[in-house]
């Protein structure tokens, strides 16, 4: 599963998922087809990997897949049945902060029917509503 090799700080604030992914990451850059998020959410590294595997399995050897998101936010948890106080919990897993219209996966080198079916399977593994988008012909 994906995680950063090194970070400046071990723990982060939870933050807010306000706003829309306006400029960065909401256009198709590499492939012809993509899976686009429609809701804000935290997507864990396990969910990202599950979606990637689903697309890879369906597309077989044909085509190429680009994962456009990376889990760079540590989520901390405290042990069960622990009393209040004594600091913040230790990092348990990593998430990627997703805002609406963010591109999650891109595909190229396959037909539209294959890409649509593969992204539909990957979308089922995501905790948010998504849509299938195609690159506009230039």
UniProtKB/Swiss-Prot annotation:
Cystine bridges: none
UniProt similarity note: Belongs to the universal ribosomal protein uL16 family.
Feature: compositional bias, Basic residues: 7-21
Lineage of the organism: Eukaryota, Viridiplantae, Streptophyta, Embryophyta, Tracheophyta
Subcellular localization(s) per the UniProt record: Plastid, Chloroplast
PANTHER family in UniProt: 50S/60S RIBOSOMAL PROTEIN L16 (PTHR12220), LARGE RIBOSOMAL SUBUNIT PROTEIN UL16M (PTHR12220:SF13)
Subunit structure: Part of the 50S ribosomal subunit.
Protein name, entry field: Large ribosomal subunit protein uL16c
Alphabetized CDD domains for the sequence: Ribosomal_L16_L10e
Single GO cellular component term: chloroplast
């Amino acid at each position: 599963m994906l995680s950063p090799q090194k970070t400046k700080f071990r723990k982060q604030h939870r933050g807010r998922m306000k706003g829309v992914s306006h400029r960065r990451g909401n256009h198709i850059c590499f492939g012809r087809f993509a899976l686009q998020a429609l809701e804000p959410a935290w997507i864990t590294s396990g969910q990202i990997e599950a979606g990637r595997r689903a697309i890879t399995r369906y597309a077989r050897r044909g085509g190429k897949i680009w994962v456009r998101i990376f889990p760079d936010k540590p989520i901390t948890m405290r042990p069960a049945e622990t009393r209040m106080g004594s600091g913040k919990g230790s990092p348990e897993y990593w998430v990627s902060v997703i805002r609406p219209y963010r591109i999650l996966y891109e595909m190229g080198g396959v037909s539209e029917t294959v890409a649509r079916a593969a992204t539909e399977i990957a979308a089922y593994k995501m905790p948010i509503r998504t849509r299938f988008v195609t690159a506009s012909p230039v």
